[in-house]
Protein backbone atom coordinates (compact mmCIF):
# COMPACT_ATOMS: atom_id res chain seq x y z
CA UNK A 1 0.00 0.00 0.00
CA UNK A 2 1.26 3.47 -0.93
CA UNK A 3 1.01 6.27 1.61
CA UNK A 4 1.04 9.81 0.32
CA UNK A 5 2.80 12.75 1.95
CA UNK A 6 -0.05 15.04 0.94
CA UNK A 7 -3.15 15.19 3.13
CA UNK A 8 -5.47 15.52 0.11
CA UNK A 9 -6.29 12.74 -2.37
CA UNK A 10 -4.99 12.97 -5.94
CA UNK A 11 -8.15 14.55 -7.47
CA UNK A 12 -7.73 17.64 -5.25
CA UNK A 13 -4.01 17.88 -5.96
CA UNK A 14 -4.72 17.74 -9.67
CA UNK A 15 -7.34 20.51 -9.60
CA UNK A 16 -5.63 23.24 -11.63
CA UNK A 17 -8.56 25.66 -11.23
CA UNK A 18 -8.41 25.46 -7.42
CA UNK A 19 -4.62 25.82 -7.44
CA UNK A 20 -4.82 28.83 -9.78
CA UNK A 21 -7.55 30.42 -7.62
CA UNK A 22 -5.46 29.90 -4.49
CA UNK A 23 -2.43 31.49 -6.16
CA UNK A 24 -4.51 34.51 -7.17
CA UNK A 25 -6.01 34.78 -3.66
CA UNK A 26 -2.58 34.56 -2.02
CA UNK A 27 -1.14 37.30 -4.23
CA UNK A 28 -4.24 39.46 -3.73
CA UNK A 29 -4.15 39.15 0.04
CA UNK A 30 -0.41 39.87 0.08
CA UNK A 31 -0.96 43.00 -2.03
CA UNK A 32 -3.80 44.16 0.24
CA UNK A 33 -1.61 43.71 3.32
CA UNK A 34 1.05 45.98 1.79
CA UNK A 35 -1.44 48.62 0.66
CA UNK A 36 -3.40 48.67 3.92
CA UNK A 37 -0.22 49.32 5.88
CA UNK A 38 0.31 52.39 3.71
CA UNK A 39 -3.37 53.38 3.92
CA UNK A 40 -3.32 53.16 7.74
CA UNK A 41 -0.31 55.49 7.79
CA UNK A 42 -2.26 58.00 5.65
CA UNK A 43 -5.40 57.82 7.83
CA UNK A 44 -6.72 61.12 9.16
CA UNK A 45 -7.65 59.85 12.63
CA UNK A 46 -6.73 57.16 15.14
CA UNK A 47 -10.19 55.59 14.82
CA UNK A 48 -9.82 55.15 11.06
CA UNK A 49 -6.22 53.95 11.39
CA UNK A 50 -7.24 51.32 13.96
CA UNK A 51 -10.07 50.04 11.76
CA UNK A 52 -7.77 49.75 8.74
CA UNK A 53 -5.23 47.90 10.91
CA UNK A 54 -7.98 45.49 11.98
CA UNK A 55 -8.89 44.91 8.32
CA UNK A 56 -5.20 44.33 7.61
CA UNK A 57 -5.07 41.68 10.36
CA UNK A 58 -7.99 39.91 8.66
CA UNK A 59 -6.03 39.96 5.40
CA UNK A 60 -3.00 38.47 7.16
CA UNK A 61 -5.23 35.67 8.48
CA UNK A 62 -6.65 35.07 4.99
CA UNK A 63 -3.13 34.93 3.54
CA UNK A 64 -2.13 32.36 6.15
CA UNK A 65 -5.25 30.24 5.53
CA UNK A 66 -4.89 30.30 1.74
CA UNK A 67 -1.14 29.59 1.95
CA UNK A 68 -1.67 26.66 4.32
CA UNK A 69 -4.36 25.21 2.07
CA UNK A 70 -2.15 25.68 -1.01
CA UNK A 71 0.73 23.91 0.75
CA UNK A 72 -1.43 21.00 1.88
CA UNK A 73 -2.80 20.50 -1.63
CA UNK A 74 0.39 20.98 -3.66
CA UNK A 75 3.08 20.07 -1.14
CA UNK A 76 4.80 23.33 -2.10
CA UNK A 77 5.39 26.67 -0.41
CA UNK A 78 4.31 29.70 -2.40
CA UNK A 79 6.13 33.03 -2.32
CA UNK A 80 3.44 35.71 -2.67
CA UNK A 81 3.93 38.61 -5.06
CA UNK A 82 2.55 42.11 -4.88
CA UNK A 83 0.34 42.40 -7.95
CA UNK A 84 -1.15 45.85 -7.34
CA UNK A 85 0.29 49.30 -6.74
CA UNK A 86 -0.72 51.21 -3.62
CA UNK A 87 -2.00 54.77 -4.12
CA UNK A 88 -0.11 57.54 -2.29
CA UNK A 89 -3.30 59.51 -1.59
CA UNK A 90 -5.72 58.49 1.19
CA UNK A 91 -8.93 59.07 -0.80
CA UNK A 92 -7.59 57.26 -3.88
CA UNK A 93 -6.41 54.48 -1.57
CA UNK A 94 -9.88 54.14 -0.04
CA UNK A 95 -11.45 54.06 -3.50
CA UNK A 96 -9.00 51.41 -4.72
CA UNK A 97 -9.49 49.36 -1.53
CA UNK A 98 -13.30 49.51 -1.81
CA UNK A 99 -13.27 48.39 -5.46
CA UNK A 100 -10.71 45.65 -4.78
CA UNK A 101 -12.69 44.29 -1.83
CA UNK A 102 -15.90 44.17 -3.90
CA UNK A 103 -14.15 42.38 -6.78
CA UNK A 104 -12.55 39.99 -4.31
CA UNK A 105 -15.94 39.06 -2.82
CA UNK A 106 -17.15 38.02 -6.29
CA UNK A 107 -13.93 36.12 -7.01
CA UNK A 108 -13.97 34.23 -3.68
CA UNK A 109 -17.63 33.25 -4.04
CA UNK A 110 -16.98 32.02 -7.59
CA UNK A 111 -13.87 30.11 -6.40
CA UNK A 112 -15.96 28.46 -3.65
CA UNK A 113 -18.53 27.35 -6.24
CA UNK A 114 -15.87 26.01 -8.63
CA UNK A 115 -14.31 23.53 -6.23
CA UNK A 116 -15.48 20.28 -4.68
CA UNK A 117 -12.83 20.60 -1.94
CA UNK A 118 -14.91 21.27 1.19
CA UNK A 119 -12.03 22.90 3.09
CA UNK A 120 -11.41 25.30 0.19
CA UNK A 121 -15.14 26.06 -0.08
CA UNK A 122 -15.21 27.05 3.58
CA UNK A 123 -12.05 29.14 3.45
CA UNK A 124 -13.18 31.05 0.35
CA UNK A 125 -16.70 31.59 1.70
CA UNK A 126 -15.52 32.89 5.09
CA UNK A 127 -12.99 35.17 3.42
CA UNK A 128 -15.71 36.52 1.09
CA UNK A 129 -17.82 37.49 4.12
CA UNK A 130 -14.86 39.32 5.66
CA UNK A 131 -14.09 41.08 2.37
CA UNK A 132 -17.68 42.32 2.12
CA UNK A 133 -17.41 43.73 5.62
CA UNK A 134 -14.14 45.44 4.67
CA UNK A 135 -15.80 46.98 1.61
CA UNK A 136 -18.51 48.46 3.83
CA UNK A 137 -15.90 50.11 6.06
CA UNK A 138 -14.00 51.55 3.09
CA UNK A 139 -17.23 52.86 1.56
CA UNK A 140 -18.18 54.44 4.90
CA UNK A 141 -14.84 56.25 5.06
CA UNK A 142 -15.17 57.32 1.42
CA UNK A 143 -18.60 58.80 2.13
CA UNK A 144 -17.17 60.72 5.09
CA UNK A 145 -14.71 62.55 2.83
Swiss-Prot record:
CDD domains cross-referenced by the UniProt entry: Ferritin_like (cd00657)
One annotated GO molecular function: oxidoreductase activity
Official protein name in the record: Uncharacterized protein YhjR
Species this protein is from: Bacillus subtilis (strain 168)
Gene name of the encoded protein: yhjR
